[in-house]
Design a protein with these regions (language model features):
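Non-catalytic terminal regions of proteins
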Residues: 40, 44, 60, 246-456
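Auxiliary, metal-adjacent structural segments of Zn-dependent hydrolase domains
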Residues: 1-33, 67, 156-198, 442-444
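Short pre-active-site segment immediately N-terminal to the catalytic Zn-binding motif
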Residues: 32-49, 216-225
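TRNA-recognition modules of translation machinery and tRNA-sensing kinases, especially anticodon-binding
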Residues: 52
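Post-HExxH zinc-binding segment in Zn-dependent metallohydrolases
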Residues: 58-127, 230-246, 257-269
């Protein structure tokens, strides 16, 4: 897909301009882990990437609870091969343009193709391929059942013999009530199972994008931890190699220059500031956990009585295995790291003319900064909460979704391109209603209705 080429060119240009301290590396969470290293890397960079990716990222993939729950390292490579072959076959049969348009729409919604509260049952790629034909035929019969129009008998009139029985209406579509009966947060799954106009091959591609989005779901919640863990171990391993005399001073100087560039955190008033560097934040917290275990201060014993003075390896492994970014920061961000990174809290209220410095470096401020920073890494804050609430199967077949607005934050400018892609997949009008505290704040439609064009 063209989006991957766009991403590759962006990384390539940044690398050529020297804007990446760590060499570009590719690591696949498979079993065994597969890592790709650039041929033009220096010896130091090859050693660094091996320590960072093959040891750091690999151990995080194998240990963290989110990856253990949501990913199946045994079968991902086989499934990627299956997906590539299937999409190539679709391009040959239906044309590149048709497949690309479908992938555009699926990629726009891929963050809404995740079951956040269910654990998928992993199956092998062979079983996936074996089930494909059966799934295509079954899904099409289910969709035909969903959208079949059968007149309901008048009230008080018994159905004719041989008419629709409960066995012929497994979804309960002709018994009244709203469909779906409960809001659905997995938009791609709902599209795959219920879109009335999609062909079987299109449903399979929606499924492929949905399964890959599910596979990458843990990475979206653990970037700070994952990169911090990898940086901690490449720093630890490289220093151990030097201490044991296996590398010389020249290689270490080259390493330290690269490492410093990776974990650099520009100040808020720097022209290069673009937010918190996840490498810097994660590395600082993991290094601080080790310090608290090895040489705790009185402040550390007050804030972290459970880990102060404990064995650092066990504590680090516990932190790596049992947290995601949000809970990791809430649990382990210390006052020292807050001071070192010079963190403070600004409140920018759209209903107040002035900015407020809401937290500084005191006991109360440390807690507020930690709470505010951890909440920024919660998916519920970073991504809009959008759910399917109704498909008008007896009316115009339109699809209605609700967006639960938080803290008066409206949807961004990309809302119309996204619902256009959703309408392309669904095939009928799409209505998106933003709500906060039970009140409607705005309505979006595609195709665009006249009253929404002038809405503010």
């Amino acid at each position: 897909h063209w989006s991957f080429g766009k991403q590759f060119l962006s990384v390539e240009q940044a690398y050529k301009r020297g804007q990446m301290g760590l060499a570009y590396e590719l690591v696949i969470n498979s079993n065994p882990c597969i890592a790709y290293l650039m041929e033009e890397n220096t010896l130091m960079m090859q050693v660094l990437v091996i320590a960072h990716a093959c040891y750091g990222h690999n151990s995080f993939f194998k240990g963290n609870y989110l990856f253990r729950t949501w990913t199946d390292a045994e079968s991902i490579v086989d499934y990627l091969v299956f997906a590539r072959k299937y999409i190539a076959q679709c391009e040959e049969r239906h044309g590149v343009h048709a497949v690309e348009q479908l992938l555009d729409a699926c990629h726009a919604l891929q963050n809404y193709g995740v079951d956040r509260y269910k654990r998928p049952s992993p199956i092998s790629a062979e079983e996936e391929a074996k089930r494909q034909d059966e799934r295509e035929a079954y899904l099409q019969t289910q969709v035909n059942m969903l959208w079949r129009t059968i007149p309901e008998p008048p009230a008080g009139v018994a159905p004719l013999p041989g008419s629709l029985h409960s066995d012929d209406d497994p979804l309960g579509l002709h018994t009244g009530g709203r469909y779906p009966s409960e809001p659905q947060e997995n938009l791609l799954y709902f599209i795959e199972k219920n879109a009335p106009l999609l062909a079987p091959w299109q449903r399979e591609i929606v499924r492929i994008v949905r399964k890959l989005a599910q596979y990458f779901y843990p990475q979206r919640q653990t970037q700070v931890m994952n990169e911090g863990w990898a940086c901690f171990w490449h720093y630890t391993l490289m220093n151990r190699l030097y201490d044991e005399g296996k590398v010389d001073e020249g290689l270490m100087l080259e390493f330290l220059q690269s490492h410093a560039a990776v974990i650099n955190q520009p100040g808020f008033d720097s022209p290069y500031y673009s937010g918190l560097n996840p490498y810097a934040l994660g590395f600082a917290i993991f290094m601080d956990i080790k310090r608290i275990c090895d040489a705790p201060t009185a402040e550390d014993r007050e804030w972290f009585p459970d880990i102060a003075g404990s064995p650092w390896r066990e504590t680090l492994e516990f932190a790596m295995r049992n947290f995601k970014d949000e809970s990791f920061i809430q649990q382990f961000l210390s006052p020292k790291v807050i001071r070192d990174l010079k963190l403070f809290l600004i409140v920018d209220d759209d209903q107040v003319e002035m900015l407020e410095v809401a937290a500084i470096h005191d006991d109360r401020g440390y807690k507020r900064i930690r709470e505010a920073l951890s909440s920024q890494y919660a998916l519920s804050v970073r991504e809009p909460n959008i759910q399917v609430v109704e498909a008008a199967i007896r009316g115009d077949r339109s699809l209605t979704l609700h967006h639960i607005q938080d803290s008066r934050r409206p949807l961004g400018r990309s809302v119309y391109p996204v619902i256009r892609h959703l309408q392309q997949l669904w095939g009928f009008p799409v209505h998106l209603v933003s709500m906060e505290d039970g009140k409607v704040t705005r309505r979006y439609h595609w195709p665009v209705e006249e009253e929404s064009k002038g809405a503010g």
